[in-house]
Amino acid sequence: MKPEIHPTYQKVVFMDTSTGFKFLTGSTRGSSETIEWEDGNTYPLIKVEISSDSHPFYTGKQKLADAGGRVDRFKKKYNL
């Protein structure tokens, strides 16, 4: 590999801001915020709005998002 053209791969902590769930993984993304992890080391902290802990597909709490009655208009249009 050519030197100095690839991003730095490091361990980071992702935190789901809606649930507070945190997980440690590898990423090329960095952050100025840091957090001390369970192992005593400090890692960059990346905040995300949705993760597998809060996403409706993974939690089983899916519901139909009807924006402005579009589903009703579709059903009415096609007599469903």
From Swiss-Prot:
Biological processes, Gene Ontology terms: translation
Sample GO molecular function, one term: structural constituent of ribosome
Gene3D superfamilies: Ribosomal protein L31
Protein's UniProt keywords contain DNA-binding: no
Keywords for this protein: Ribonucleoprotein, Ribosomal protein
Gene Ontology CC, one term: ribonucleoprotein complex
A Pfam family matched in the record: Ribosomal_L31
Family: Belongs to the bacterial ribosomal protein bL31 family. Type B subfamily.
Protein name: Large ribosomal subunit protein bL31B
Organism name: Shouchella clausii (strain KSM-K16)
Gene: rpmE2
